[in-house]
Amino acid sequence: MTGSRSYDSSSIQALSPHQHLLKRISLTFGSESGDSGHPFSSQKSTAVREVVDNAVDEVSAGFGDRVRVTFFKDGSVQVEDSGRGIPVDSSMDANGRMVSGVFKALGIIQSGGKFGGSGFSAGLNGVGAASTNHLSRRMDVSVFRDGKRHRVSFQDGVPGFFDTEGDPDAGFTELGDYAYLEVSKDRRPKGERDLFPPGTTIR
C-alpha cells in the first residue's frame, strides 16, 4: 500500500540541542524507574553523577584532593571539589558571542574540555554536566579562584539569577551577557561548588 502523506523537507525536524535533550532524555540519563516522586529518582541520580564525574576527573588528574557530595533532606544536592574550578575568563564561542568559561562548560551542550585530547574516563565525554544543567529547573554554580567567588545560576541551561536562594520556582532574571559572572571576595580555597536546590527535576 502506498502512503498518502507527502514527504518533503518540511517533514524533517531540526531541533536545537536543548530541544533534542528534552525529547530524548532517556538516551542521556536512562529510563525512569521506581517512585517518580522520590527526590533522587534514577534519572536525577544519573544526572548528578555526571557533575560528580567532572569533579572526580580533577582529582584523578592531580589537580585536587577532595570531592564532597552532600544530599540534603529537602531534596537538594551539592557537589564540591578542590580542583581548579571551571575557567572564569571569557572567550568567543562558535556563534561569535563572548561567553565565560562557566557558560561554555555548562550552557553549551556541544562543548567540553575533554575534546582537546586531554580527557579522562568519567562522564559523557565532556557533555554530561551541560546536559544535566539543561534538564534542571535550577542549578547554582560557584567557582573559587584567586581569592574570589564567581557565581551564576541557570534555569534550563539559561544563565541568570534567581530572586531568592534555594527555591527553583523563584523569579528568574535571564542574563543577556553570557560573559557575566557575579564576583565577590572570598578567601576559600580554589575549587568549584554546584548546587541542585530542592525540587530540582529532570524535565
Summary of predicted features, one role per range:
Residues 33, 71, 79-81:
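Compositionally biased, low-complexity repeat tracts
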